[in-house]
Protein backbone atom coordinates (compact mmCIF):
# COMPACT_ATOMS: atom_id res chain seq x y z
CA UNK A 1 0.00 0.00 0.00
CA UNK A 2 1.23 3.51 -0.79
CA UNK A 3 2.54 5.75 1.94
CA UNK A 4 1.44 9.31 2.70
CA UNK A 5 4.13 11.85 1.73
CA UNK A 6 4.53 15.26 3.37
CA UNK A 7 4.39 17.99 0.72
CA UNK A 8 4.11 21.39 2.44
CA UNK A 9 2.37 23.21 5.26
CA UNK A 10 -1.27 24.08 4.59
CA UNK A 11 -0.40 27.74 5.27
CA UNK A 12 2.00 27.64 2.29
CA UNK A 13 -1.05 27.43 0.00
CA UNK A 14 -3.19 30.56 -0.09
CA UNK A 15 -6.94 29.92 -0.05
CA UNK A 16 -8.53 29.87 -3.51
CA UNK A 17 -5.23 28.98 -5.21
CA UNK A 18 -3.19 26.03 -6.36
CA UNK A 19 0.48 25.08 -6.23
CA UNK A 20 2.62 22.56 -8.06
CA UNK A 21 4.59 19.89 -6.19
CA UNK A 22 6.62 16.84 -7.12
CA UNK A 23 5.49 13.42 -5.97
CA UNK A 24 8.36 11.22 -7.08
CA UNK A 25 8.81 12.32 -10.70
CA UNK A 26 5.16 13.36 -11.21
CA UNK A 27 4.01 16.98 -11.20
CA UNK A 28 0.92 17.33 -9.02
CA UNK A 29 -1.37 20.36 -8.81
CA UNK A 30 -2.63 20.85 -5.25
CA UNK A 31 -5.63 23.13 -4.71
CA UNK A 32 -6.99 24.79 -1.58
CA UNK A 33 -10.35 26.16 -2.73
CA UNK A 34 -11.52 27.59 0.62
CA UNK A 35 -10.22 29.11 3.85
CA UNK A 36 -10.11 25.63 5.38
CA UNK A 37 -7.91 22.54 5.45
CA UNK A 38 -9.71 20.95 2.48
CA UNK A 39 -7.29 20.17 -0.38
CA UNK A 40 -7.51 18.41 -3.73
CA UNK A 41 -4.76 17.04 -5.97
CA UNK A 42 -4.71 16.24 -9.69
CA UNK A 43 -2.00 15.98 -12.32
CA UNK A 44 -0.48 19.34 -13.22
CA UNK A 45 -0.28 18.36 -16.90
CA UNK A 46 -2.94 19.81 -19.21
CA UNK A 47 -3.66 16.82 -21.49
CA UNK A 48 -4.78 19.01 -24.38
CA UNK A 49 -1.37 20.71 -24.69
CA UNK A 50 0.86 18.48 -22.53
CA UNK A 51 1.86 21.59 -20.59
CA UNK A 52 2.50 21.86 -16.84
CA UNK A 53 -0.07 24.55 -16.09
CA UNK A 54 -3.14 23.27 -14.21
CA UNK A 55 -1.87 24.48 -10.81
CA UNK A 56 -2.19 28.04 -12.17
CA UNK A 57 -5.78 27.56 -13.29
CA UNK A 58 -8.89 29.29 -12.03
CA UNK A 59 -10.79 27.42 -9.29
CA UNK A 60 -14.58 27.65 -9.44
CA UNK A 61 -17.71 25.86 -8.30
CA UNK A 62 -20.83 25.11 -10.32
CA UNK A 63 -23.82 23.06 -9.15
CA UNK A 64 -21.85 21.78 -6.18
CA UNK A 65 -18.86 20.63 -8.28
CA UNK A 66 -15.43 22.18 -7.68
CA UNK A 67 -13.26 22.41 -10.78
CA UNK A 68 -10.19 24.15 -12.16
CA UNK A 69 -10.08 25.77 -15.59
CA UNK A 70 -6.83 25.33 -17.49
CA UNK A 71 -5.13 28.69 -18.06
CA UNK A 72 -4.57 27.77 -21.73
CA UNK A 73 -7.93 26.96 -23.35
CA UNK A 74 -10.10 26.90 -20.21
CA UNK A 75 -11.07 23.22 -20.25
CA UNK A 76 -12.49 22.39 -16.83
CA UNK A 77 -11.24 19.50 -14.68
CA UNK A 78 -13.19 18.34 -11.63
CA UNK A 79 -11.08 18.51 -8.49
CA UNK A 80 -12.75 15.47 -6.92
CA UNK A 81 -11.66 13.01 -9.63
CA UNK A 82 -9.80 14.80 -12.49
CA UNK A 83 -12.64 14.32 -14.99
CA UNK A 84 -12.57 16.78 -17.90
CA UNK A 85 -16.03 18.30 -17.94
CA UNK A 86 -15.90 19.00 -21.67
CA UNK A 87 -14.44 15.71 -22.88
CA UNK A 88 -14.01 12.69 -20.60
CA UNK A 89 -11.30 11.12 -22.77
CA UNK A 90 -8.93 13.88 -21.62
CA UNK A 91 -9.32 13.44 -17.87
CA UNK A 92 -6.27 13.79 -15.63
CA UNK A 93 -4.95 11.62 -12.81
CA UNK A 94 -6.40 12.25 -9.37
CA UNK A 95 -4.36 11.86 -6.16
CA UNK A 96 -5.51 11.23 -2.61
CA UNK A 97 -4.78 14.33 -0.54
CA UNK A 98 -5.25 15.25 3.10
CA UNK A 99 -4.07 17.67 5.76
CA UNK A 100 -2.64 16.14 8.93
CA UNK A 101 -1.31 18.28 11.77
CA UNK A 102 -1.18 21.29 9.44
CA UNK A 103 0.81 19.45 6.74
CA UNK A 104 -0.52 18.68 3.25
CA UNK A 105 0.07 15.03 2.40
CA UNK A 106 -0.37 13.04 -0.80
CA UNK A 107 -0.61 9.29 -1.08
CA UNK A 108 2.13 8.10 -3.38
Curated annotation (Swiss-Prot):
EC number(s) given by UniProt: 1.7.1.15
Organism taxonomic ancestry: Bacteria, Pseudomonadati, Pseudomonadota, Gammaproteobacteria, Enterobacterales
Stated name of the protein: Nitrite reductase (NADH) small subunit
Quaternary organization: Associates with NirB.
Gene Ontology biological process terms, A to Z: nitrate assimilation
Alphabetically ordered keywords of this record: Cytoplasm, NAD, Nitrate assimilation, Oxidoreductase
InterPro entries: NirD, Rieske-like_NirD, Rieske_2Fe-2S_sf
CDD domains to which the protein is assigned, alphabetical: Rieske_NirD
Known catalytic reactions: NH4(+) + 3 NAD(+) + 2 H2O = nitrite + 3 NADH + 5 H(+)
Biological source species: Escherichia coli (strain K12)
Chain's role: Required for activity of the reductase.
Protein family membership: To B.subtilis NasE.
Main location: cytoplasm
Top-level lineage group: Bacteria
Location of this chain's protein in the cell: Cytoplasm
GO cellular component terms, semicolon-separated: cytoplasm; nitrite reductase complex [NAD(P)H]
Single GO term (MF): nitrite reductase NADH activity
